[in-house]
Amino acid sequence: MIPVILLPGKLTTNSQGVRGDSFSTGRRYSEAVARAGGVVVQAQPIAQTTAAAHELVARFDGVIIQGGGDIDPNRYGQKPRSNAIYGISLEHDELEIAVIRAAIELDKPVLAICRGIQILNVALGGTLHQHLADVLADGESHWDKHHEINLEPNSRVAKAMKTVAPKQSHSFHHQAIDKLAPGLVVTGLAPDQTIEAVELNAKKWIVGVQWHPEDDADTEPDQQNLFNGFVDAIAR
């Protein structure tokens, strides 16, 4: 049986040939999963889908949470305090949090990418740095840059990628984890100590990464291996 992966979509207003707004998922996620032997199906961020999240997740083999705009700071007990915050969607937040919590309860494998690692942390009670430029000497070091990442040797992410120093790790974010949620363990750091990977060890395979492995997965084996490891976890 082909593993079928649920991926919550996001609202988009610029789809060619579609009248009005539409929902989208990134093509590169689907292609990376397909190379690993799975297939991606989108869940639309509307109230009816969120209300049925537990039943919906139960029908799938795993979950990917994709990158996107920022999470509403009210979700982690703060008010917006940076003009750099962008792309907040309450519906998007609600669906992803519901899907993450359902996946954890049902012990489904989860791969949470970029915004995904952030909302995984928020869903479990953690907080975020609202703008890295406010806390790092080089505030642009994670915005559309490739940089080194150091992984814990025995972590799920290192085992999946088959390395502790993955090549071509592309970051495109201005926020990151601040206070780590209970239960999560840090398994990867950037040279500036920004959290780059987390895992929920109490469950089957819950992994979050701050960079975008899908961006280079078609040419860089280290990055594709993360998707391979995710799909392999479904079979175990």
Regions found by a protein language model. Name each.
Residues 1-111, 122, 129, 133-161, ...:
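N-terminal beta1-alpha1 cap of cysteine-dependent amidohydrolase-like domains
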Residues 117:
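The feature captures the ABC ATPase H-loop/switch
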